[in-house]
Amino acid sequence: MTPSKWDDEEESVSPPPVVNRRKFDDEEDEEVLDSWDAAEDSEVEREKAAKAAEAKAKAEAEAAAKKKSKAQRIEEHKAERRKNAEADSEEDEDEDEDEAEKRARLRRTEKDSDLKHAEDLFGDIDLNRSRNRGAPKAIVISDSADPTQAVDLSAMPLFKPTTKDQFARLTTTLIPLLTAHSKKPHYALWAQEFTKQLVKELNSGDVKKIASALTTVSNEKMREERAADKGSKKSKAAKTKVSLVANRDNKIDATSYDDDGLEDDDFM
């Protein structure tokens, strides 16, 4: 065979046909099932990622809240309390409620909010144990004429002294209010009981110092009273002497020395 013929035969040779593999009846179903499994795995992963993101955001929020200062938390608490009070007020607008009941309700709401805020601030601290150690209790003074008008003395800065100057200020505020009643019959008995209650939480050494200070005051009072008594006696004696001299000097001799009734023979 000539070379040209060989070339023609090589060019006429066609590539072998591609034989398509026949799919089995269940092969398509397996592909669908694999797709579903992949979709389920993807959904689970998305849920896990969402939960992880939520947990991370919550942790970041808690960390940010812990970093806030006490003043910031108190301010947020006040804003929340005002918001709750306004919401309660709007809800009760249609109800038949007088002004006194409204104020009482708002006060209860505020108190509940304060308690919740205290729990948020102190967390798992045993508040009852702290109270037993002498933590101040709420001292609410209300007006007998208007019970809705009340003041919590324990919340006032004056009654939360910590420094020497603050205690001095508390003293200068209370003493004039209390000693103004010193002339009343029950004041002395009240002062005794008040003093005992006042030093009840102190140790014996501090109580002894206070007792010594009271003894010093008692001795000073005794000296003052004795000096006053001596001065009073001297003044009284001087007044009595002056009165006697004045009475003696001012006595008038009313005897009549006229010659009426006397005869010449009377001198014989």
From Swiss-Prot:
Location in the cell reads: Cytoplasm
According to the record, the residues making up region (Disordered) are 1-117, 219-242
The yes or no answer to whether the keyword Coiled coil is present is yes
Bias (Acidic residues) ranges: 26-44, 87-99
Q: Which domain of life is it from?
A: Eukaryota
Keyword hit for Cytoplasm: yes
Q: Which family does it belong to?
A: Belongs to the eIF-3 subunit J family.
The record, for HAMAP family, names: eIF3j (MF_03009)
Q: Which PANTHER family match?
A: EUKARYOTIC TRANSLATION INITIATION FACTOR 3 SUBUNIT J
| Protein name in the entry | Eukaryotic translation initiation factor 3 subunit J
